[in-house]
Amino acid sequence: MAETNVVLDAIRSRRSCRAYEGEMVPKELIETVAEAGTWAATGMGRQSPVIVAVTDKAVRDELSEMNAKIMGTTSDPFYGAPVILIVLALKKRPTHIYDGSLVLGNMMLAAESLGLGSCWIHRAKEEFETEEGKKILEKAGVNGDEYEGIGHLALGYPSYEEKPKAAPRKPGYVKWVE
């Protein structure tokens, strides 16, 4: 394998976590993960995304119910994670989906580097198009008519004994023009 450093190590070792302990993550660690998201590249540096950190259990559970309903299940789509970081981005920016996706990627790598588990959970777009979703955003000072949900980051301490193994990288993943 090629050269290594702490960034490449985090990239190679990160896995989606689908089992969490109930213990709340300290606010300082949540802030560190969220701050990593703010350093993501954005189209023309316009920083279209916002991050809504949810640590209130009642709101977290409400989001879980909404998300599960969209998915057509009754199980917790956040896998028991105590913290949900919601990424939304300004709809009027043509790069908003890409911008928000990079924010989520940065936060997943930061979580890995801090020994936290994380998992990107979809259906944020559908969730925050509803009046119920917009009311939740309003609590955080976000106008749900101007922002589109990009994704949720479930965040917490992993409850598994051993991290899942990565699937081998597929052959021909990288193509060259030399």
Provide a role label for each language-model segment.
Residues M1-E178:
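Acidic, surface-exposed loops and disordered segments
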